[in-house]
């Protein structure tokens, strides 16, 4: 079945990932937490130009090639769709994710005095810097950042087709409804499992529960000491089909 296919695709990248050219010349410890500038590593990453984006974005070349095929086939299968459906977000490095987090910490969640509760509020939809799947250049947000937009019209056509067909191109929705913990449902978020599956295992090996202090020493963001202990749970509580 398709679950088995995704597992086999992911396993292919897990073996000796630390020595793999998957990181290019970026140190594994840095790659896994997004501590790099994608524009300086065009052997791995490329700017997205073939599909509309809301601003200049970069993505892994292998993941983009797969998504381009998906995008093209989705358009052919659904001729009523507009031809300018956008990628809303793609690769976000550590600095970029830190900006998102700190703006929310100081902004819309500022009135929550308890730092743990403030962090949990942000974590409903935004990752701690150093834990986001967007760091890896394998995950993108597509069309809209509102779940309700996928209940009707264009969004419903997209989501219905994606849930049936995305796995054929290596993509999986990591944040589905009904999971026991972690981020809220994100119908817009899709991950290229042939690469991200191995990267999640690598993150656990390098920065998992037993080495969380190592992760904490490499990231710096508001509330890190209060919510950092939860990092592993948010990295790993995903759709079982994406494991």
Regions found by a protein language model. Name each.
Residues 3-12:
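Bacterial N-terminal signal peptides
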Residues 15-243:
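Extracytoplasmic cell-surface/polysaccharide-interacting catalytic and binding patches
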């Amino acid at each position: 079945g398709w679950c088995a296919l995704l597992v086999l695709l992911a396993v292919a990248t897990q073996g000796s990932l630390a020595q793999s050219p998957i990181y290019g010349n970026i140190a594994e410890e840095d790659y896994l937490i997004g501590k790099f500038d994608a524009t300086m590593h065009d052997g791995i990453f490329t700017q997205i130009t073939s599909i509309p984006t809301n601003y200049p974005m970069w993505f892994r070349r292998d993941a983009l090639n797969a998504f381009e095929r998906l995008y093209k086939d989705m358009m052919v299968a659904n001729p009523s769709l507009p031809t300018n459906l956008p990628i809303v977000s793609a690769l976000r490095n550590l600095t970029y994710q830190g900006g998102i987090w700190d703006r929310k910490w100081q902004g819309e969640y500022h009135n929550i005095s308890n730092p743990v509760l403030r962090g949990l509020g942000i974590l409903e939809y935004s990752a701690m810097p150093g834990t986001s799947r967007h760091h890896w250049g394998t995950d993108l947000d597509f069309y809209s950042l509102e779940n309700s937009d996928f209940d009707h019209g264009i969004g419903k056509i997209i989501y219905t087709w994606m849930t049936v067909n995305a796995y054929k191109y290596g993509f999986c929705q990591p944040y589905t409804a009904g999971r026991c913990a972690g981020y809220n449902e994100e119908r817009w978020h899709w991950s290229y499992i042939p690469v991200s599956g191995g990267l999640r295992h690598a993150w656990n090996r390098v920065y998992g529960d037993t080495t969380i202090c190592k992760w904490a020493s490499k990231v710096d963001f508001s509330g890190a000491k209060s919510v950092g202990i939860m990092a592993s749970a948010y990295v790993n509580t995903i759709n079982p089909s994406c494991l």
